[in-house]
Each structure stands twice: as structure tokens, then as C-alpha cells.
A protein has these predicted regions:
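Extended, low-polarity transmembrane helix blocks
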Residues: 1-36, 57-65, 69-146
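Membrane-interface interhelical connector segments
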Residues: 34-55, 59
Length: 146
């Protein structure tokens, strides 16, 4: 069972995928948890998620954990498949609840009312590749699976 969950190839593909996704997602998680990088912080984020978006509080907490702890998990390669699946689900929810209504493209020229979902779709693709492939070289998963 451990090999199925933690098993991975000893290659750099998983390493580059998890570092890329983890490093891109971590600042978003830090915005939500600590208010860094112009973020609102935990209390304000929870308020937006539960009142404006109508998410149940446990779901809102899981979203925040996926973007923060999940991103850290990807960076170090711990529970890569679980962290990547969580991020894929969060990005799917972001498309469904927020960004899908704004079309495909990001708001490059400031002419849309919001951001499209192209970024989220890329993150989903990268996350699902990690779910299939695993964390790769220099991951805790690799050491656990031995």
C-alpha cells in the first residue's frame, strides 16, 4: 500500500513538476493564511469563502490548507499525490465558483470584469500529472517507498 501511495520514479520530471506547482501555489496560500503578498489573511479569507462564495467552513479550511500546506508538501515531495490532488480539486472549484464566468483568458489588458481560468487549467494539468507520476527525484515520498 505504501508503495502505491508514495512510489515514484527516480527522475527529474516529478521533481520539476512538483517544484513548479508548489512554488506557484505557495504564495497564494501565504496570502490566505498570513496576509503576505497583499493577501487578506486567514480571518478575512474565511469570511469571503463562507459568506460571499457560500462554502461550508470545513471546505474553506481545506482550500486554504491545499494552497499552503499542500504547496509545501509538493516542494519537499511529501504526500505528493495527495497534495497534488488537493490542489487540482481547489483549482477545479476556482473555475466552477469564480473564474469560469470570466472566460478562458486572464485579464491581460484590464478589459474583463475578472480573471479567466487558463491559469487554473494549467495548474490542474500539472497536478494531475503529479498524481499519476509521483514526486520524482529528491522527494520524501521516494525515501518512504523504499
Amino acid at each position: 500500500m505504501m508503495r502505491i501511495f508514495f512510489g515514484t520514479q527516480n527522475d527529474t520530471a516529478g521533481l520539476f513538476m512538483r517544484l513548479t506547482l508548489g512554488l506557484v501555489m505557495l504564495p497564494h496560500g501565504l496570502q490566505k493564511v498570513f496576509g503576505l503578498f497583499g493577501g487578506a489573511g486567514l480571518q478575512a479569507t474565511m469570511n469571503v469563502f463562507t459568506t460571499k462564495l457560500g462554502l461550508p467552513a470545513p471546505v474553506a479550511v481545506m482550500v486554504i490548507l491545499a494552497e499552503s500546506a499542500g504547496a509545501l508538501g509538493l516542494i519537499v515531495g511529501f504526500c505528493t499525490r495527495l497534495c497534488a490532488l488537493g490542489i487540482a480539486m481547489v483549482m477545479g472549484g476556482a473555475i466552477f465558483f469564480v473564474h469560469g464566468q470570466h472566460g478562458f483568458f486572464m485579464n491581460w489588458f484590464g478589459q474583463q470584469t475578472g480573471e479567466g481560468f487558463e491559469y487554473h487549467l494549467l495548474a490542474i494539468g500539472l497536478a494531475l500529472a503529479l498524481v499519476i507520476h509521483g514526486g520524482g527525484k529528491w522527494s520524501f515520498d521516494q525515501r518512504i517507498a523504499r
